[in-house]
């Protein structure tokens, strides 16, 4: 899990990549 990334970059990724949050939750 990458809280800092999920707070910023992953919010953007999530809008682009449907697996964005799952990928970062699993370790990036």
From Swiss-Prot:
<protein>
    <recommendedName>
        <fullName>Unknown protein from spot 154 of 2D-PAGE of etiolated coleoptile</fullName>
    </recommendedName>
</protein>
